[in-house]
Amino acid sequence: MKIEKCPFCGNININLMMPNASGRMVPETRQLNMSRYHLIVTTEDIFDTRYITMITNRSLVKTSISAEAYEKYASLSPEAIAEMIKFPAIICQESKEYYGKTDEEQQAIYGLIRKITKINKNVHIYFHPLCYIPQLKLYENAVDFGIDVSCAISDLNHTAWTIRDVNLLEACQDTGIQILVPST
């Protein structure tokens, strides 16, 4: 994997091998916009599948994302989706305890969004995992990641797809979480 930092635009270009529709690995260059990230919390098995199905009333809800992000992305227009797939993602299963707390065993996925499609009242979010991160670290450093764990049913306990106005690379660096992007 070759990674370049774009000092003028705040984006990161990643060259990696991705499977195409037939499963064959082909080179792909992805430009990541690190100014925001997807936080996807689900009850689905995130380790055996490469997509999440989210009902629309839990997708980019006005009360769970910034007003600017809601205005830009909630429509799921082709232009919005083209911009959203440039954000990295944290995909995780609902935490095991109240307030977003979990044990050391529960893992989240740091990855890339490959495709977003809306079908009736569902949104399919296809992703490519890059590495695992301990979900307990997200809980312990929730403020750094823009995650609210102040109530019993927190952001990590509630199935939802949100976009956080947090630079995921900086948050991971600040909290000592190793991901597959070099230090800047």
Predicted regions and their residues:
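Generic structural hydrophobic/aromatic packing signal, biased to beta-strands
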Residues: 3, 14-16, 39-41, 89, ...
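Generic intrinsically disordered, low-complexity segments enriched for polar/acidic and small residues
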Residues: 5, 34, 44, 48, ...
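Low-complexity, compositionally biased segments
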Residues: 14-18, 23, 48-51, 158, ...
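Structured alpha/beta reader/binder surfaces that contact nucleic acids or chromatin modification marks
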Residues: 57-142
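Long, low-complexity intrinsically disordered regions enriched in small/polar
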Residues: 1-28
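Flexible, charged surface loops at secondary-structure boundaries
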Residues: 1, 32-33, 82-84
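Contiguous surface segments at macromolecular interaction interfaces
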Residues: 2-5, 10, 122-184
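N-terminal helix initiation/capping motif
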Residues: 19-66
